[in-house]
Amino acid sequence: MVNRRDLIKWSAVALGAGAGLAGPAPAAHAADLEWEQYPVPAAPGGNRSWQLLPSHSDDFNYTGKPQTFRGRWLDQHKDGWSGPANSLYSARHSWVADGNLIVEGRRAPDGRVYCGYVTSRTPVEYPLYTEVLMRVSGLKLSSNFWLLSRDDVNEIDVIECYGNESLHGKHMNTAYHIFQRNPFTELARSQKGYFADGSYGYNGETGQVFGDGAGQPLLRNGFHRYGVHWISATEFDFYFNGRLVRRLNRSNDLRDPRSRFFDQPMHLILNTESHQWRVDRGIEPTDAELADPSINNIYYRWVRTYQAV
């Protein structure tokens, strides 16, 4: 736990968290106190209230991977998968220090990219709200906070950001995917990106870009909050710094030819990874970029999850 001096220092800078916390080097902090500054932006509905889920919430206010970490998280893929494209998921490339979970991208000897990967030991179920305060990396890899079902069929991307990009590096890219695994096919999906002021910036299905991003922050330059309210099997609301930016439901983008939708629990995932479509286009991090600690790390200050009860 940080001392009183650290707490005072953090309190002074935390006032800007709603608009993003800028700064070259994240410092120690009192995140367990800090997230309480931010009311859950979503209403729990009915006569329910929000109850914190300690099993899926962490202030990362410790060092290394003690039982505090290991009781909640796995630092490798649950099935031992190495990851997509040139990813090589690695437990050695995530750690906790200075009040942050740090997830790193670094060159592997075989030419692939070591990618830190952390997932919750147990899944969560709706109705819930989950949110991270994070700073994306500056790499050509994606910086992510997402949810995935145990059978790898249902996926919700709260944020998937390519921090190196001048425009897309300003987007909170949200998405859903519904897969069939055998034989593999993608049954349904929809991706949309949003700027920090809440404006619509990108349609991933058509490739359309809306606005030039002038005056919008590059997400690699500061901490921002990214959250999702999983309301039901067919309803999700996405929040950027506490602002509602997207409603996903059957009246707009949500489809499922199976008519099951998101009817099963999902695990939380915090990671970085390589994507095949970018590899195919030659968009890959260089050795120098992967060795540069000023851009090759994602910093997660905290993750909090609440159940509506």
From Swiss-Prot:
GO MF term list: beta-agarase activity
Catalytic residues, chain numbering: 155 (nucleophile), 160 (proton donor)
Taxonomic lineage of the native organism: Bacteria, Bacillati, Actinomycetota, Actinomycetes, Kitasatosporales
Catalysed conversion reaction: Hydrolysis of (1->4)-beta-D-galactosidic linkages in agarose, giving the tetramer as the predominant product
EC numbers: 3.2.1.81
Alphabetized UniProt keyword annotations: Glycosidase, Hydrolase, Secreted, Signal
Protein known as: Extracellular agarase
GO terms under biological process: carbohydrate metabolic process
GO cellular component: extracellular region
Highest rank taxon of the organism: Bacteria
InterPro entries referenced in this protein's UniProt entry, alphabetically: Beta_agarase, ConA-like_dom_sf, GH16, GH16_AS, Glycosyl_Hydrlase_16, TAT_signal
Signal peptide: 1-30
Cited Pfam families: Glyco_hydro_16
Family from the record: Belongs to the glycosyl hydrolase 16 family.
Compartment(s): Secreted
Residue intervals of the GH16 domain: 33-309
Primary location class: secreted
Post-translational modification summary for this protein: Predicted to be exported by the Tat system. The position of the signal peptide cleavage has been experimentally proven.
Gene: dagA
Organism of this sequence: Streptomyces coelicolor (strain ATCC BAA-471 / A3(2) / M145)
Broad class of enzyme this protein falls into: hydrolase
